[in-house]
Amino acid sequence: MAILSSALVTIDLPVTLVSLLVGSIFYFCYLTVYRLFLSPIAHFPGPKLAAWTYWYEFWYDVIAEPEYTFKIGRLHKIYGPVVRINPDEIHIADPDFYDTIYAGSGRKRDKWDWITRSFGVDESLIGTLKHDEHRVRRASLSPYFSKQSVRALQPLIDRNMAILLDRLREFAKSGSPLKLDDAYAALTNDIVEDYAFGRSDHRLEAPDFDPSFRDAMLQGGKAGHVLKHFTWLMDLLKKLPDSLLLKLSPAMGAYSQLQTSVKRQVAEIQHAHQMHTYDKTRRTIFHEILNSKLSDYDKSTDRLWQEGEVVVAAGTITTAWALGVSTYFVLATPDILRKLKTELEAAIPDPSQPLNLITLEALPFLTGVVQEGVRLSHAISHRLHRICPDETLIYQDNDNQREWRIPPGTPLSMTSNLVHHDERVFPDSHAFKPERWLDNARLERYLVSFGKGGRACLGINLAYAELYLTLAALFRVYGTEQVKGKDDVGTLQLFETSAADLVITSDTVVPVMPEDSKGLRVKVS
């Protein structure tokens, strides 16, 4: 009997291997035929290799550099405004079609799990796939990011801005170069953490402004390109301790440590809420969520830490980058600085008095500076995805006299970088020109750094408040050697920094400086 069993195993093993081989070949052939000829989007233009396999995107984002976002721009120059960029996805490059894809909450827009799963925050607002579930979760957070709520936050922003101005005076005394990109990340992080959790890590007070949170998020963005192709890897990494993960992958280790920190903060808030030991006079986002009518699951630690990570990350990185871009161009362009200081001096006669956000928002040139900073910082370097589950979208390609009918359920995307550098909308698009926004309200339609529609960035009002208040407070009392105001307390001079330091050279989801850049540095005097 044992001999017979051994013989059967000997016979079955080759048969099994052959069956697997034949099955694999059959599946490979079927997948090839389906993707290239039978898919509902098989007729859309684009490279056949991209239509056939996801390895095409993998090559540009993982093997070469995280640069598929730039390759997509080059593909549009070859194939036109509609391009199939992988087996399932259509990318559009037409600013006038943006509002159709990123429609308001009255039209259903889902997200694509192939993208959202790469961040490991599937239960957060940005990771919520279905339109209706997203709307419920968003409704629980929206009140805390309304214009009224954000204006009530001004004392918090002012306190942190005062700390930053104190730090500038320290650097003036020491003569050391100040890394403003780190300082701005510390500023925005301290503000959003305090609002979210009722406490902050006081990064503004750290000697080096403690850029660890920002750096961990950027490393997580790099890892995301790998993780979206290998979903099992995310599950494996979650099971490893941070100490081991740091050795295997410093990028993922730093990102995991960040998540551990956010989990701890959310757990502490939940414990204080259960024990009724939190300060009820302070209105913070996550204390209020626990008092909301959301389901018990939506209030669980497993979900709320993901929301916490997204709120803090989005509230830190994108606004800090926009501040950096704005500051560089203002300092590098004397005429812009002169016009800005003239406007600020007229609107703020006494710089020692608290700023008025409503007054600042009405200043046309300051608004132009803010809008150009937002436009050229892009906020998100990656394309934004949407799925229209129940409607066929029709794109009219007028240049080529072609109508494209995009089937329901097809992942669609556009990229802010391509919209903001469309020369038909923004002539001389790479130039920082605040005056392009003066008496030109139509341009606001094409400013898409924060997305649009029912899934637009929730923190847009907070971001704008920080931009207005920070730039006004800074340039009301600081000038340069070439441009000085009567009430200035010092000057800021760019130090070994050029426009090349602000060029986005890789896609880590959010913009990041070139690897050889030393940052946005200034000398304070």
UniProtKB/Swiss-Prot annotation:
Compartments annotated for it: namely: Membrane
- Family matches, as PANTHER family: CYTOCHROME P450, N-ACETYLTRYPTOPHAN 6-HYDROXYLASE IVOC-RELATED
Q: Which cysteines are joined by disulfide bonds?
A: none
Signal sequence residues:
none
Pfam family, any one: p450
The family database entries (CDD domains) matched by this protein are listed as: CYP58-like (cd11062)
> Domain of life, per the record?
Eukaryota
Q: Which GO terms describe its molecular function?
A: heme binding; iron ion binding; monooxygenase activity; oxidoreductase activity, acting on paired donors, with incorporation or reduction of molecular oxygen
Q: What is its EC number?
A: 1.-.-.-
Question: Can you name this protein?
Answer: Cytochrome P450 monooxygenase tpcC
* Gene3D superfamilies xrefs: Cytochrome P450
The residues that the entry says bind heme are C457
| Function summary | Cytochrome P450 monooxygenase; part of the gene cluster that mediates the biosynthesis of terpestacin. The bifunctional terpene synthase tpcA converts isopentenyl diphosphate (IPP) and dimethylallyl diphosphate (DMAPP) into the sesterterpene preterpestacin I. The C-terminal prenyltransferase (PT) domain of tpcA catalyzes formation of GFPP, whereas the N-terminal terpene cyclase (TC) domain catalyzes the cyclization of GFPP into preterpestacin I.
The cofactors named for this UniProt entry are: heme
